[in-house]
């Protein structure tokens, strides 16, 4: 018996930028029936890094064969493997091209056992809602604590990490390995909703506004409304705006 049905959609808008550097996808695994992988990556200074995220993720996910029961630790490792492999490939490509591509990463993996596992690197975000109410939003706090605890940075320097090329937490940074923050929730059920988005979207909304948009509309309707509102609030000065919306709904009874 299916615990839920998945409704998902992706949407993008170029904003006032000359090109779209974000990439989004919703994938199913070739050897993992019932598993769904949602991805969002924001390419810095071009789309190459974000494109590599999607390419590597598909390769790894297609080779993934799950066990018989819930195993969130294994799903989390799959997401870490995607980050590590993509980071390595981007760095190898930089040796050939002479240009270093960077990209953020947000991944959400849903299993038919009711597991939701997510991972992120950089300033793209994942939100989780229950019936439209915000319950979780990814942030930089774990990375900041890592910089203070292991790298012995001051609190001020750690919190300003985005301004430093040395400390920039992205895939492809030759100066620093990506710091992956992972989380999961068991017992997913109809009414649970997720939003993966780039900073071109989350910058213009409160958590409550995003949750309300997802709760009252289909993924397509919600994404169209959010893109239109982001363009309005940015006054034509917004950047690339991208999102993946995933909603768990009641399965249709036969």
Each model region followed by its residue ranges:
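PP2C/PPM-type serine/threonine phosphatase catalytic domain
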Residues: 1-254
